[in-house]
Amino acid sequence: MSMSLDPVATLSPHPLLSRYAECSMWLARYMERIENLARIIDVTETFVRSGASDGWRAIVQINADEERFYASHSKATADRVIAFYVIDAENPTSITSLALAARENARALRPLISTEMWSQLNIFTQFLRGLRAEDIRPSEISQLCARIKQECQTHTGITEGTFYRDQASLFYNAGRQLERADQITRLIDIKYHTLLPVAAGVGSEVDISQWTSVLRSAAGYHAYRRVMAGDLRPSSVVGFLLKSEAFPRSLVCSLRHLHNNVSRLRSDYRLRDAGGIVERIEFLRAGLDDQTVGQIITRGLHEFLDWVQRQLQDVQTEVAQAFWPPPRPVSAPDPVTIEMSGQTQSQS
């Protein structure tokens, strides 16, 4: 008796698929966000040590956490921002909170994921929960961030090597690319307008150091140097982060992979509700492809990036409406809502 390998023949029942789809996408988003946040904290600590003044405030701005942060802190200092974003259990955007949310999604996915994937997430989460104030001092933060990034990259490697390639993996990869696109636009938006009024001027030692920090925050410094050696003009850096087809964290690259994953959900698994989402992603890609970097900057970089972020939020909303389970009955327990950068996930 032969076993069918047709992906359509192995579809899960719709409610089960919906739950797994949601958890797969948010697991990827949370782990990607943890790695991005650890990298930005690490780069900021190095950059501020060299004399920058607004680096810690920029982290709060990138994550759109001004209201939450300044409700309990009068100023964005190193100690306060690091504690807020690493160990603050009351902050849903802290690395520890994100890791706990990721583990809960992995728990729901336990029938689908490997023992290695589950064990590594558990070990990582327990490590973060054990952190104390002395572990996150500015003098220790670089080493800590390196450990966090390494754990996230280990998760990515285990997932790549063990996660079965079906709808769940497509939702996982779509979530990772959606998060990358959102994070890169936030980074460019805040950093570009923070760094433009540099008194020392374009091309100065301070200016070069600042734009180097932007590239390092996006894990793109060495890739950029390969193709743009010696050119650290703001427009060149922005162009690379937006439009490089070869840099995996660029906006254009993230949107291409996002489109591929959602398109496969429609074509390979006959999920017809993906059609409108594919069209929105195509609309978003066209908005990027139809303009040069110079045109985007001249017409308004902030306005363009704000438009991209709104389109990305609409993509997430439409995915949820198309594939997530319907709301629970009123008699059911209230879900715990995790709010991240203007987007939410309801966790039972």
Name every feature range the model reports, one short phrase each.
Residues 2-348:
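Alpha-helical transmembrane segments and their helix-helix packing motifs
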